[in-house]
Amino acid sequence: MKILHIDSGILGEHSVSRRLTAAIVSQIKADRPDADITYRDLASERVPHLTGAQIMAPADLEGVDPDLAADVRIGRQMLEEFLAAETVVVGAPMYNFSIPSQLKAWIDRLAVAGKTFRYSEAGAEGLAKGKKVIVASTRGGHYSVAPASAMDHQETYLRSVFGFFGITDIEFIRAEGLNLGADQKQFAIAEAEKTIAEGNVFKLAS
């Protein structure tokens, strides 16, 4: 089993999303010691955002500036890691009602026509079918119910973009209300970790 583990939280050891993705991957490893895990820390790697030059670069990169060529190769490697993975574990904190810009930059490297999606006369078709995506979703407030749910451009975006890639098996393990007091934070984390510890994650990833 190939696992791709992605962290995007910028708070380092204080990041709850990192804590949860580590627990998810640890649970999978305990049940599947043979799991082959690739890890990327998008906050420390500082994935460059897309540029016109990157998009227009020739496939063979002949004559391309060395820095631009390196940027293109990073994107290609990220795409190959994603395509090779059977299960993708993503740490996705909510920042200002959406996802971290680092995570968006990574997703932009995955959204490649002919690789993760294609267009035909019938419309768009996802090409990354058969994968499992597990998202550790963390939020300072409560956004899973109305009226605040209208401001959720985090989970809704991730479900949409992975769905666009053809992935229908998407699970969110959520810890929200983290900024609403110490008791609420402790409760939310404990509930998320309980879900992971019960082994539900491995069943989803198998």
UniProtKB/Swiss-Prot annotation:
Domain of life of the source: Bacteria
Reaction equations catalysed: 2 a quinone + NADH + H(+) = 2 a 1,4-benzosemiquinone + NAD(+); N,N-dimethyl-1,4-phenylenediamine + anthranilate + 2 NAD(+) = 2-(4-dimethylaminophenyl)diazenylbenzoate + 2 NADH + 2 H(+)
Uppermost EC category: oxidoreductase
Protein name, per record: FMN-dependent NADH:quinone oxidoreductase
Entry similarity comment: Belongs to the azoreductase type 1 family.
Function: Quinone reductase that provides resistance to thiol-specific stress caused by electrophilic quinones. Also exhibits azoreductase activity. Catalyzes the reductive cleavage of the azo bond in aromatic azo compounds to the corresponding amines.
InterPro entries: Flavodoxin_fold (IPR003680), Flavoprotein-like_sf (IPR029039), FMN-dep_NADH:Q_OxRdtase_AzoR1 (IPR050104), NADH:quinone_OxRdtase_FMN_depd (IPR023048)
Quaternary structure note: Homodimer.
UniProt binding sites for FMN: S15, V16, S17, M94, Y95, N96, F97, T138, R139, G140, G141
Keywords: Flavoprotein, FMN, NAD, Oxidoreductase
Keyword Ubl conjugation: no
